[in-house]
Amino acid sequence: MFREKLKRELQGIKDENLYRKLRNQDDFILNFSTNDYLGLSKNEEVILAYNEGLKDGAGSTGSRLTSGNFKLHEKLEGVISEFKETEKSLVYSSGYAANVGVISALAKKGDLVLSDELNHASIIDGIRLSRADKLIYRHSDVQNLIEILEKNKYYENIIVVTDSVFSMDGDVSPIDKIAKIIDEYNAVLIIDDAHGTGVLGQGKGTLKHFKVKASDNIIQIGTLSKAIGTSGGFVSGIEELIDYLINNSRSFIYSTSLPPAVISASIKSFELVEKERLSKNLEKNIICANKLFKNHGFIKCESITPIYPFVFGEKSIDISKGLINHGIFGVPIRYPTVKKGMERIRISITSKHEKNDFKYLCEKIDKLTI
């Protein structure tokens, strides 16, 4: 009965052309779907640091509150705090766990959470778990956010949460304007800087990009699995926030901590981003890609991030399959992740790509769209 039920549901997914399956990235010559924006996952120094961390064991053996707290964890948290210019930080097992754990711990029943309509699924899930009241404001629409805040300012606790860089379009939230608004309404701002850390603000992230100083009511969440090139998540803010999360954030309390090797590699990655300004090469590639992609008509507006939505509608799946035949990995993004008619190939570039890579991609898409 159970097997048959699953088969029926899977067939329904296939019938709607929404079926997903795993692919091995080693099968491709050119990867345009990676989040490894700075190429740090394959950096020799990062790998050496990872191997050094193995001396403390292959696994962490427990949660941070039991047997899984190492000096390396606390060292990484210090490195992140300095990097993000905050008082303290806390490392989570993933970016998803960080968003879910922070939001569900801070927002309670009777509180109000205002969320951008295009926020990541982990933010949406965190709000659901919190049982707080939720209102959605139009995408990056500051005026709409003000209107909603004005109508609901009687709430004692208000949290505004937004992605910094939106993962499907690569556009950037107007954090500078939102930061001013939350002060006026005595609200808290949670920023998911997953795609901004290592990319914007000379690598420091979105606050630095907008020249907004970290403050008591701004919380920065990030991931180690994108530009940093390892795995895990983190949150940065005031000391009392971190102490509160250690005692109240369920995804932190009840998760096995990250292995020492991952922590060691992450420390090295942050050092490299800080000292070598790795985002410089990425910025050059973004300028190059902007020109080529726009000339070929794949984008209308230039980007300041490495994410490009090539919107082809329903043709996106077939074009993606065609790219695979040419050794190019470009993931098709379909409904319900994006609206119907807005299906796209999400192209992400890295500091390791070269101009000829962009040219090759454009040439093959041109042929596939004739």
Curated annotation (Swiss-Prot):
Residues modified to N6-(pyridoxal phosphate)lysine: K226
Record field: catalytic activity: 6-carboxyhexanoyl-[ACP] + L-alanine + H(+) = (8S)-8-amino-7-oxononanoate + holo-[ACP] + CO2
Annotated InterPro entries: Aminotrans_II_pyridoxalP_BS, Aminotransferase_I/II_large, AON_synthase_class-II, AONS_Archaea/Proteobacteria, PyrdxlP-dep_Trfase, PyrdxlP-dep_Trfase_major, PyrdxlP-dep_Trfase_small
PROSITE patterns (UniProt xref): AA_TRANSFER_CLASS_2
Keywords: Biotin biosynthesis, Pyridoxal phosphate, Transferase
Database matches in CDD domains: KBL_like
Any one Gene Ontology molecular-function term assigned to this protein's record: 8-amino-7-oxononanoate synthase activity
The protein's name: Putative 8-amino-7-oxononanoate synthase
Organism expressing this protein natively: Methanococcus vannielii (strain ATCC 35089 / DSM 1224 / JCM 13029 / OCM 148 / SB)
